[in-house]
Each structure stands twice: as structure tokens, then as C-alpha cells.
Amino acid sequence: LDYPYIDGLDGFVSELDDFVKDGWGIADHQKSYGGKDHTWTSIEIIPLIVTYGTKKAKQGLRGELNEEYTKRFPIIENIINQITTFDDCLWLAVAKVSPKIGTIKRHSDKGIDKMNAGIQIGKTARIHYCLRSNPEAYFELQDLQGGTNTYHMKQGEYWYMDKRKPHAVHNKGDTSRYHMIFDMKITQTVLDNLII
């Protein structure tokens, strides 16, 4: 997705890291693909509250916007408002993948929210926004034929990702990889403003 580059990303990432300090963690609904070494962590700005239905099926409910982050870092809203609004975000997080050995194990995110994923009105879309990366950090996405596609996402780029397909992240570089990740409602306004 091609949107204008937002200045100040390196400063934002450094300040966010200083602000969060040891508060980086892994949400309960993400622990199964955290790996035994926990080489990645995240913070949730709009948390996903996972509940279980009568058949033990996972359901995700949108939590409250954590204004502690958005008031301190207005750039977060600037990033979101290029493509959607906080009101239409169902989940918003920043993920940090460690250097050299950082891995988010292969997984798919289907079934967490009750709405179907996709780029149609009434569905939800997963967007990755690259805050900071390096040439040796990459994203793997399985296609329907069983092949693996590798993507090197660059700072300031928005990427749509079909979260229903198996995917993984690897960081073999010397610096941490930071992405802002959000699930958003697809509305007519979003479709009208999509720049692909």
C-alpha cells in the first residue's frame, strides 16, 4: 500500500523503547507462537480481549484504546489516520523482534475475531506498518499452493497481510525489527481511500 512517508520514525521507536522499558511482553493470545526463547515481544495499544465461547472457540473483543501511548506519541494516530481511524481499529500493537535470532513462529490468525478477514466492506484487514527494520529481517507468507513468499518490508511502508494464511517473521540482522500491526474494519471510506 503506497502512502506518504511519515518523518520521525527512528526517534519514535527510540522514545517508545525508553518509555516501555521492561514492559514489552507477549499477550496471552500470542504465546503459542512466541517460541521457547521468546525472541519477540509486543505492546498492545488497543488490546484484543480473548474470550471463549461455549464450544471453547476463541473470540476476540476490542479492548479500550490505551491513551497513555497515544497522548505521549501523537505519531501513532498520524500513522493510523493515513488509512483508517482508531474507532475502526479492532486491535493495534507494536511488535519488536530481537536481532540475530528473532523469530515469530509460523502461525495463522484465523478465528480470533468473529468477522471474516478480507478486503470487502464489513470484513477486517490486517495491516503491517514498518517502523524500523534491517535488510536481514523478513516476513514469510504461505500461498494457497503451499509455496513460501518472502518479503522485506522497509521503514515507512504499509503492507496488507492475509492473516488467515500461515506466516512467520525472522530477524537475522544486527538491530531489532519494529512493526505497528493493526486489524481494521473495511468500510466504504477505507476502500475509497486505499492507495494500492
Residue ranges and their predicted role:
Residues 126-130, 158-160, 174-192:
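A short hydrophobic beta-strand segment most commonly corresponding to one strand
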Residues 109-119:
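Short, P/G- and charge-enriched loop/turn segments at secondary-structure junctions
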Residues 96-97, 117-137:
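Short, conserved beta-strand element in jelly-roll/cupin
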Residues 145-169:
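Short terminal or interdomain "cap/linker" segment that borders an active site or interface and mediates
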Residues 1-87:
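Non-heme Fe(II)/2-oxoglutarate
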Residues 130-154:
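A short beta-strand-loop-beta hairpin characteristic of the jelly-roll/cupin
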Residues 86-110:
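A short glycine-rich, His/Asp/Glu-containing loop-to-beta-strand
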Residues 107, 137-139, 161-173, 181:
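Short beta-strand His + acidic residue motifs that chelate non-heme Fe in jelly-roll/DSBH
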